[in-house]
Amino acid sequence: MDVQTLMAASAGAVASRLLCHPIDTITVHKQTIGKFSFKTMPLKAYYRGLPISLTLITPATCLYLSTYVEAKRRFKPSVGEGAILYSICGMTAEVVSSFVWTPLEVIKARTQISQKGSVINTISTLARSEGLKGFYRGYWMGVAIYLPTTVSWWVCYEESKKYLQKQSNWDISVIAPICSALGTVVATTISTPLDIVKTRYQVATSSAMRKAEYGLQAEKELGILEIAKLLFSKHGVKGFTRGLFTRMCYIMPSGMISMSVFESFKSKDID
């Protein structure tokens, strides 16, 4: 993986985060507290958690994409081009990058629903109350969620990219966002129910979440199954689709921007 590829991945990650972070904040509010109002939420609140996102999103995205590219280079001679290769590479990239993504998601989600909205306060409170394991809260669930999500996304993306490259003379900067959007629709629909449970589990011990959702039960540690049962009992099936459209509105442009920039710079290296 050369420097140009890493710079391209970084540029795409930063650009997509700056443009799409407010939508992500709205999604987290809907998935956790369940309350959101444009009238009562100040403008700066939409960017809660942005500093930590920008700090970690770049190395996390670079790690994810570089792992995928390297895995593709190593496995392609023995596996061949196709869905199996994309699945293996996607899973490898997800498992490796989740070591960075999980703490980011925990800190970001807690900061976004916090009244103070301070990253430093979120980190210090989490470290003091839960220690290191608090930052990796929901790691294995995240891996379980994002493995099928990653596989479905990369298979849709790569297969549709091959098809469009054969059937059209479009530039990769046009093909990449189209294929990314298609992969996002499929992957997001598959992953949203479990992602909601994961997000609620990651912020379950925060004061904002306890006050909004769990009441007296907040004093005890809530497991993943308990959170899922509480969600179903209070909101029914639709509770597991909360923020689906908003989440898709965030992930889709974010992925389109990232992949368009990345592919424009490094499409020859990937292929």
From Swiss-Prot:
<dbReference type="InterPro" id="IPR018108">
    <property type="entry name" value="Mitochondrial_sb/sol_carrier"/>
</dbReference>
<dbReference type="GO" id="GO:0048250">
    <property type="term" value="P:iron import into the mitochondrion"/>
</dbReference>
<feature type="transmembrane region" description="Helical; Name=4">
    <location>
        <begin position="138"/>
        <end position="158"/>
    </location>
</feature>
<feature type="transmembrane region" description="Helical; Name=6">
    <location>
        <begin position="240"/>
        <end position="261"/>
    </location>
</feature>
<dbReference type="InterPro" id="IPR023395">
    <property type="entry name" value="Mt_carrier_dom_sf"/>
</dbReference>
<keyword id="KW-0999">Mitochondrion inner membrane</keyword>
<dbReference type="GO" id="GO:0005739">
    <property type="term" value="C:mitochondrion"/>
</dbReference>
<keyword id="KW-1133">Transmembrane helix</keyword>
<dbReference type="GO" id="GO:0005743">
    <property type="term" value="C:mitochondrial inner membrane"/>
</dbReference>
<keyword id="KW-0813">Transport</keyword>
<feature type="transmembrane region" description="Helical; Name=1">
    <location>
        <begin position="5"/>
        <end position="26"/>
    </location>
</feature>
<feature type="transmembrane region" description="Helical; Name=2">
    <location>
        <begin position="49"/>
        <end position="69"/>
    </location>
</feature>
<feature type="transmembrane region" description="Helical; Name=5">
    <location>
        <begin position="170"/>
        <end position="190"/>
    </location>
</feature>
<feature type="repeat" description="Solcar 2">
    <location>
        <begin position="81"/>
        <end position="163"/>
    </location>
</feature>
<feature type="transmembrane region" description="Helical; Name=3">
    <location>
        <begin position="84"/>
        <end position="104"/>
    </location>
</feature>
<keyword id="KW-0812">Transmembrane</keyword>
<dbReference type="GO" id="GO:0005381">
    <property type="term" value="F:iron ion transmembrane transporter activity"/>
</dbReference>
<dbReference type="Pfam" id="PF00153">
    <property type="entry name" value="Mito_carr"/>
</dbReference>
<comment type="similarity">
    <text>Belongs to the mitochondrial carrier (TC 2.A.29) family.</text>
</comment>
<protein>
    <recommendedName>
        <fullName>Uncharacterized mitochondrial carrier C4G8.08</fullName>
    </recommendedName>
</protein>
<feature type="repeat" description="Solcar 3">
    <location>
        <begin position="171"/>
        <end position="268"/>
    </location>
</feature>
<keyword id="KW-0472">Membrane</keyword>
<keyword id="KW-0496">Mitochondrion</keyword>
<keyword id="KW-0677">Repeat</keyword>
<feature type="repeat" description="Solcar 1">
    <location>
        <begin position="3"/>
        <end position="74"/>
    </location>
</feature>
